């Protein structure tokens, strides 16, 4: 239902703040809610199942003499004395009250077995037997539940209530009860109830289906049901146990489906959908925590939640007041109102805590995925751990779970329901079993008793004849049942012990505390991110202060000369923001001790050998480097501080390379996260190179708008591509098609003879060889999957080209590991012992080099992008003509490139756009060589321009490499493709390839239009040239000016 008034959203703020509080402390809220709900649950169960008592007796043990008392009531009792002629039937009460000196019990036992070889046991006190029936006469009512025969067969009395596997019998009894009630009810009422239950089950099914569409797993849907069930039990407890309003089980059975259908789960579904979508949209930007996501979700949907529930609550209260003379209806309306009230309470508490927990699990899972991907892509584990702590992604989908896991989850739930059903309903289940296993009709005295009564029963006597008791041989499943029941019985007895119960309670408390601790530990990244953002903002403000206020003295008197202006080093401080590093603190220590000498080299070497390098000053560490005692590459490991290592390396190189520029700040190095660089992006780091980053867009690609970042130092490039975006959008945007996705690696091997090389090629080309190599290759990674191996021979050299999917990573390192292992398996397992691996990379890939194989076969992502530009847009925006553009494209991009013998270069300047986007997004700039392979086609269609770019070898990734750096990662966030995709690995990288192709499309369109109109040189002169500084007026007279003019003419002629 839409909001009825505008201020409704403000009403949701209180419950939104409650949901944020719950999201920050999910374990506490969940435990507290479940404990309260469990108390209400036990109270309600005790109310409805009044035979079940909350005492210390185990639910698996019966009360003393319970079976004997029940059997005595079911016996047929007969009395005789000397004054009576024959036997008189009496009741059980009379049999227990009459003072007869002798009371005998006649047990009627039947041994029934489908196996005729099973022998019937021999029993004492047998007075009569016929076929499979034995009569036992004894003076006490004791029935053996198990009897053994001479051949070892064990017989069991089937009236034992502890039968977990008699489902068929129980089903029959329930069916009989159900049939009897249905036949007595009105057909129209039955139809309504059946319809209501069908709608209720459909609503529950819709809950799971809708949750699955949002990307949720099974447990979030189940938690929604638990939330509603808790509301039901709390409402029942308040209504019946506190208010004393009785709601019968029949009323609850009839009315509950209508409540479920009317209220439904739509609000919880929308809250979960908003939260999960928000989590995916935020991606890896680290600007929002899980409790903030939950807060926004409840704020968005909370208004409608309050509105719908309050309307229903008022309706039920009004109905209860209007129909107060109908007690059953009134009580049910009160119950329904309380159900909705507790729904309003539990949704921002229990359900929000569950949702926050789910988001936290997504974050943890995302961390694991990123760490594994980075390690497989060649990033050192320490750096991978650093990145995975700050950048996390989730992968979870109910449909992607294995069938075994789903079955196990469902089995746990069904087991829980069955245990409750079995324990709490034990009494009436026992009655149902007895009605089937016992013949409860009144049993007459057998002839062998009545005929010999005068001889055997001369005095007063009572004979109680039991119903027919059935014994059956024990089967294998019953032995399993016995083991299960024995285990449960022992556990139940152990838990009742006063020491064990306290131990279990202590273990529960410890478990809850540990879970809280572990969850808080998993959420450290959230608080860490928030603290870092706050520190960054504070640092930015501090760095905006005027530079003239800096009073810190400099280390040297050297100056930085720029043009004709001279400025001291103190004014050349970097203006980049971020927290100060330990190297700056060490610099201050160096400044304070300028008059102190550096310790002797021998003493420094001793400290280095003892592992105390961190205690040295930067100048002392630099001295060790200068004297060759400490390698440049080992500074990060020895100092344990990447930023300090960069500072020391700059000091040392400024002397070793005689490069005083490194002692200045012209190449910045401060306030940069070198932890992400170490072991992943660069070695011997001395700083970072700032590049200007522009943005083009919005550019509509396949119906979605993107702003595309470009890092470049070429003027007009961003402006030109921006004009292309405007023209493409005017035609409805760009359309893309991805035709291939597979990174390649091409090893080269050698065999002793050409025949062996040829045989190996034939084997690799066969289905057997392909499958064998795929199995070996795929075992090396959870992401890389081998698609195909292409081979070729050159003499005895065999070249192989492995084509592999690599998820969202660019994947060169990932493939190299798989190729290396596959070649090893060929030598060791597949019979190619004489194969010699010449190189893991034989340039048959081909990587970072122009090659026709990449142009023909493709490498990485093969994308075709197309757009239709209306004719009037070509004229007004591009300032050109459709026919002129088509003619220019043919002459320049097709004929001109062919005349130059180009391979993959049938375009105007695809490399310009590809390189600029690669630099901005942390891609490998060297792979611009093959990624820029592109053919641009244009044609006129009904007066409009249709332009397309076909790029068969775009090599990109959204995780690993330069994407781990924060600035580049931020630009990937701008596009919404950072890190691995949550549910479909490879989707983000493929989308990035589409974006790159469309950026090239915009650039091609604009440049070709500029060339066709002759605007290229003019635009570069306008944007790339600064206006000349005005010259000072001279004092030349007219005679001198005329002389200079004549001289210039003479010079030109000569």
Swiss-Prot record:
The active site is at residues 714, 848, 924, 1020. Glycans are attached at residues 115, 181, 452, 490. GO terms for biological process: coenzyme A metabolic process; ergosterol biosynthetic process; isoprenoid biosynthetic process. It is a multi-pass membrane protein. GO terms for molecular function: hydroxymethylglutaryl-CoA reductase (NADPH) activity. Residues 1-28, 209-217, 268-309, 358-400, 520-1054 are cytoplasmic. Residues 567-582 have a biased composition (Low complexity). Its main location: endoplasmic reticulum. Residues 50-187, 239-246, 331-336, 422-498 are lumenal. It is an enzyme of class 1 (oxidoreductase). It holds the Pfam family HMG-CoA_red. It comes from the Eukaryota. NADP(+) binds at residues 781-783, 808-816, 1024-1025. Gene3D superfamilies: 3-hydroxy-3-methylglutaryl-coenzyme A Reductase, Chain A, domain 2, HMGR, N-terminal domain, Hydroxymethylglutaryl-CoA reductase, class I/II, NAD/NADP-binding domain. The chain crosses the membrane at residues 29-49, 188-208, 218-238, 247-267, 310-330, 337-357, 401-421, 499-519. The modification Phosphothreonine is found at residue 552. It is found in: Endoplasmic reticulum membrane; Nucleus envelope. Residues 189-357 form the SSD domain. Pathway: Metabolic intermediate biosynthesis; (R)-mevalonate biosynthesis; (R)-mevalonate from acetyl-CoA: step 3/3. Disruption phenotype: When both HMG1 and HMG2 are deleted, cells are unable to undergo spore germination and vegetative growth. HMG-CoA reductase; part of the first module of ergosterol biosynthesis pathway constitutes by the early steps of the pathway, conserved across all eukaryotes, and which results in the formation of mevalonate from acetyl-coenzyme A (acetyl-CoA). HMG1 and HMG2 catalyze the reduction of hydroxymethylglutaryl-CoA (HMG-CoA) to mevalonate that is the rate-limiting step within the first mosule. The first module starts with the action of the cytosolic acetyl-CoA acetyltransferase ERG10 that catalyzes the formation of acetoacetyl-CoA. PANTHER family: 3-HYDROXY-3-METHYLGLUTARYL-COENZYME A REDUCTASE. Belongs to the HMG-CoA reductase family. This is 3-hydroxy-3-methylglutaryl-coenzyme A reductase 1. It comes from Saccharomyces cerevisiae (strain ATCC 204508 / S288c) (Baker's yeast).
